[in-house]
From Swiss-Prot:
Taxonomic path: Bacteria, Pseudomonadati, Pseudomonadota, Alphaproteobacteria, Sphingomonadales
Protein name as it appears in the record: Transcriptional repressor NrdR
Function: Negatively regulates transcription of bacterial ribonucleotide reductase nrd genes and operons by binding to NrdR-boxes.
Pfam families cross-referenced by the UniProt entry: ATP-cone, Zn_ribbon_NrdR
Note on cofactor: Binds 1 zinc ion.
Organism: Zymomonas mobilis subsp. mobilis (strain ATCC 31821 / ZM4 / CP4)
């Protein structure tokens, strides 16, 4: 495995274990050249999933793009990278379990919002603001108000 710090090809596996949800193997590695430690994940590749965009063009599902989007929404929030990884794993498992090889970007966005809603309400609102293309402060206010009323209803 190539070291992300010095690009050396030789690294040694220091620890290997399955992830919490059992969908991957997490490996802690140490570069034999610079000594840096890094983590890799090994996953089973089920099938190629295609995302149908709003303009009808198709592109391969990009797990790292979804992780980036969720990470941006969760920035400076009490959400760990492991929680983000679990959320994305859950979404990907649901897509694969559906048996379909294609999913609309709309459905993918909805699934992501569903997961974020239970994870962190601020991250949920941040993601929704981009996904739903809020154009005015009022859009934020209305959405935040609806989220607040749902949270209060759940608490009662």
């Amino acid at each position: 495995m190539r070291c992300p710090f010095c690009s050396c090809e030789n690294s040694q596996v220091k620890d290997s274990r399955p992830t919490e949800d059992g969908t991957a193997i997490r490996r802690r590695r140490q570069c034999e050249e610079c000594g840096a430690r890094f983590t890799t994940f090994e996953r089973i590749h089920m099938r190629d999933i295609v995302v149908i965009k709003k303009d009808d063009h198709r592109q391969p599902f990009d797990r790292s793009k979804l992780i980036r989007s969720v990470s941006i929404a969760c920035r400076k929030r009490p959400v760990s990278p492991d929680q983000i990884e679990l959320l994305v794993n859950s979404i990907q498992q649901k897509i694969e379990a559906s048996g379909e090889s294609e999913i609309t970007a709309v459905r993918l966005g909805e699934m992501t919002m569903e997961g974020l809603r239970t994870l962190d309400s601020v991250a949920y609102i941040r993601f929704a603001s981009v996904y739903k293309d809020f154009t005015e402060a009022r859009d934020f206010e209305d959405f935040a108000r609806s989220v607040r009323s749902v949270i209060e209803a759940v608490k009662e």
